[in-house]
Amino acid sequence: MATHNVEDGTGGLDASIRFAEEQARAENVGDGFANTISVLSGFSTRYTSIADTIALGLVMGVQFCGGPRIPFRGGRIDATEPNSPGVPEPDQTLDSHIASFARQGFTQEEMIGLVACGHTFGGVQHDPFPNIVHEMNDTNNTESVAHFDTTELHFDNNIATEYISGTTQNPLAVGFNDTTNSDKRIFGSDGNVTMRSFADSPELFSSRCSELFARMLDTVPKGVQLSEVITPLPVKPGRIEFKLDGDVLQFTGNVRFWNLAEKSNRIALLLWSDHLGATHNSTLLPSLSSSIDYPQGTATSYRFGGEDASGLSLDAAAGIVNMQFMLDGKLQSQQDAGAGVDFAVQDAVVFSTTSCFFGNNATARYDMAVRKTANVKSVYIETETRDDSSHIGVTETDFFSPDPNAAVNSAYTIWTLNVAGSFNTRYVGAEIDGVKYTMGKLFTPLPALPSCPS
């Protein structure tokens, strides 16, 4: 965020900090950024940018440490090169800090709030900042970190109460090197009015931090359009998978409900319609981790299928068109109020259990079952790769072709492709009725498949 320039719209939260050139600048000294990127970038996908995972990391980190809810919007775009320098440094003057935050779009009062909110956590480490923190030679603090307040792992207003009471040990407020006491200069720049208000009211501190953190996360380069605020959906199906085994279509998946009231004898049903116009239902079973508490609420999960987790066995010709979920006789909706909603299900292209592995050359024959009545233009491999900056690229290669000799049943034909083993993440994609879908990951490792007939 600190690289943003409100005048020309450049910089902001765009994950440019992942570039080694930007991390090597004196303003970004230490390994904190590299460590953070190494963790959070792994959660990015082709659909979710690294910049969005950085933003979400702050949202979750603050909440799990006792802080307020921060409105989250998605849609950040990862930078393709380092941004211009401009991160404030502790040895700079108050005027330069005020100017720096103004360039980013924040007033002097907001600057005080952002620094206080950010410094409710953490501290300053000796190794990258020997001119701020002495070596402590403490076996309980081997990295010699001087904390901003006495509750460095918890969100609270102690950063303000300790500062106002004169008991603070904040190394940027009462450090031995007054040149780097930037917090002292910033906090006192309005006569301590803002910090005193934070010290007097934990509620004000919390609400103000939520507002400022949200603005910080939403500071993006010109032209980037963020989404509306994202909140957990009341109903969210996931991990939908199909396997065709002869005339049987194995159907597995789960569904997550948000903030259900506790109830031990709840009746949960999956309802679905098939291609022949019939409707069906099956009892949902609790997932292994059926209920997980989060700061915002509770996620309750169920799975489809039998006790052995094999999934539902559907007649291949009938298949499935859409599904709904019912709890205690009431259809569940994507909205907080409503009469339920159909979730469309795609069974036009599915994995076939006739897929197999050639053990002698580390190659698999992947068979995809294609519904005869579907308008399927192509079936292909999608390969995901990450470049040196962790950006994910997707290429479409290796198209499947129909196998006229592999008639499985009256509903499906088999399209086949031999695929060599790879360390890249690969999926099967298909174009159906002019729309491209990603079906799911290829089975890995290859030896998990049955051996191909010799």
Indicate where each model-derived feature is located.
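Catalytic cores of secreted/periplasmic or lumenal enzymes
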Residues: 1-454
